[in-house]
Amino acid sequence: MVVRIPLGAKTRSGPFHANMIESWFLNDPGLVIVFPSNPQDAYDLLVEAAALPDPVVYLEHLGMYGLRGGMTGWGDRIHMQVDTESVAKAIESGDTYKLGKANIVRGGSDATIVTWGAMVHVAMKAAETLS
């Protein structure tokens, strides 16, 4: 079972704007939490979540919705060709593809910024400013 939950701030986002509820679910045993940061993550995590026997909470930041011209709610361009084959091959072979694995977006030696979801784009801007 996959439960998709929109959250996060964006213009006219109604009851979703003030809640970042991932911490509510993180300590529940047997519950898988996913939070995509780009269109490829969104596809891969949804397909992989649907194949799991465990319940999955699929959190979706509203800033990633309605990408006009590939723009996030923060003005970042994330045009992406989505690969629909790699995750399917991993599932068919019984492997995990992205679940349970960290995605290191940028390496470095001075500081560590840990984030998830749409905030990856904000963290990347911060890292660029700090470098």
What is each stretch, according to the model?
Residues 1-114, 119-122:
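Conserved thiamine diphosphate
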